Design a protein with these regions (language model features):
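N-terminal glycine-rich, Lys/His-bearing helix-loop that initiates the first secondary-structure elements
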Residues: 1-51, 428
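PLP-dependent enzyme catalytic core of the Aspartate aminotransferase-like
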Residues: 119, 128, 146, 293, ...
Length: 429
């Protein structure tokens, strides 16, 4: 179906015909833990990767399979692996690339959970990270060490929606024989496909825009199929015979899909952050309306940014669509159809004013999720990024007067009126 447009692919890939067992047009929920083999040889072939198909529910499921194929197609990858959460997708990706003694280069301004994973949790397992200003290409390249295993970026940083120059950083990574990993959660494949700009691996918290309704946890890893795992000699767990899987080389056995096949066969097998069939089904429902929802998110965001940029109680709006934003040129290059419906602004005052503004909103919900059809708000410094010290917060341009908004799909008049009510409360009106 590669010739079809995005809006068609999001509805049909993975189930081009009715379900062969039931003739159901909707993708069924295959709520099972295991699968019957036709005979002993069939079982042996499945376990030996000689025959593709279901082995056990921790590894594969037919509902999950449709979701994986659909997101892989939307991102332009060769294969994908769904996980129980976005955090699991990111963790598995790094664990597949780096072991004790290895090193990662990562953008400074990333999601707080990803920052903590790289800065604290993985250091306990011997993997270190150098955080860089992704706008300084020399700094990015100078951070690469002999033991570096990957460069890690976000298409739109969390929470400020800052934008790296993906093409340029991909060239640096590939010059040093490294894969470029990009979290495209905020970008979505409808607005940007990082693989087309040189990314080798794309990850998502599918909980966000892909699901879109704040109901379902899930993550997904997309393999571009373009990285040569054998060339550098650095990725033995993927390219060399694997002793925990009867000596198979995933690069040989799975070809372009070696990366996600390794994660499925080894990391998912051993640690089990498996997506449930029901969650895969719900994420498929979200995928089917992705383009429609994103268009409304973008339309509303443009109007909210304009409103905030001209409001006397706003100190600064951190949105790349604004001409004065340092990433404006990159925004126009990588997001010609708009984007960044999750962003921050700094209210005049400090923490007290930020809290009062937030606590007087009614349409916006105060919660930690983003990318919902409902508009959402939070104070990052005291919540999502509260594990960071003052210096780390400043590096990510998060202050006590910083407020994060996730613009939903409500009527724009109601969104603006709610924000006005928040500002009025701060003024004591």
């Amino acid at each position: 179906m590669s010739d079809y447009k995005f809006e068609t692919l999001q509805l049909h890939v993975g189930q081009e015909q009715a379900d062969p067992a039931t003739d159901s047009r909707a993708v069924p929920i295959y709520q099972t833990t295991s699968y019957v083999f036709r005979n002993s040889q069939h079982a042996a072939d499945r376990f030996g990767l000689a025959d593709a198909g279901n082995i056990y529910g921790r590894l594969t499921n037919s509902t999950q399979d449709v979701f994986e194929k659909r997101i892989a197609a939307l991102e332009g990858g060769v294969a994908a692996l769904a996980t129980a959460s976005g955090a699991a997708a990111i963790t598995y990706t790094i664990e597949a690339l780096a072991q004790a003694g290895d090193h990662i280069v990562a953008q400074k301004t990333i999601y707080g959970g990803s920052y903590n994973l790289l800065e604290h949790t993985l250091t306990q397992f011997g993997v270190t990270t150098t955080f860089v200003d992704a706008h300084d290409l020399k700094e990015v390249e100078n951070a690469i060490q002999p033991n570096t295993k990957a460069v890690y970026l976000e298409t739109l940083g969390n929470p400020n929606s800052d934008i790296p120059d993906i093409d340029a950083i991909a060239a640096i990574a590939h010059k040093h024989g490294l894969p470029l990993v990009i979290d495209n959660t905020f970008g979505t494949p409808y607005l940007i496909r990082p693989i087309e700009h040189g990314a080798d691996i794309v990850v998502h918290s599918a909980t966000k825009f892909i699901g879109g309704h704040g109901t379902t946890l899930g993550g997904i890893i997309v393999d571009s199929g373009k990285f040569d795992w054998k060339a550098s000699g650095k990725y033995g767990n993927i390219a060399a015979p694997n002793p925990s899987y009867h000596g198979v080389s995933f690069a040989d056995a799975a070809g372009p899909a070696a990366f996600v096949t390794y994660i499925r066969a080894i990391l998912l097998r051993d640690t089990g952050a498996t997506i449930s069939p029901f969650n895969a089904f719900l994420l498929l429902q979200g995928t089917e309306t992705l383009s429609l929802r994103i268009e409304r998110h973008v339309e509303n965001t443009k109007k909210v940014v304009e409103f905030l940029a001209n409001h006397p109680q706003v100190e600064k709006v951190n949105h790349p669509s604004l001409p004065e934003h340092p990433d404006h040129a990159l925004y126009e290059k990588y997001f010609p159809n708009g984007g960044a419906s999750i962003f921050t602004f700094n209210i005049k005052g400090g923490r007290e004013e930020a809290f009062k503004f937030i606590d007087n909103l009614k349409v916006f919900s105060l919660l930690a999720n983003v990318a919902d059809v409902k508009s959402l708000v939070i104070h990052p410094a005291s919540t999502t990024h509260s594990q960071l010290n003052d210096e780390e917060l400043a590096e990510q341009q998060i202050y006590q007067n910083t407020i994060r908004l996730s613009i939903g799909t409500e009527h724009i008049d109601d969104i603006i009126a709610d924000l006005e009510a928040g500002f009025a409360a701060v003024q004591g009106q």
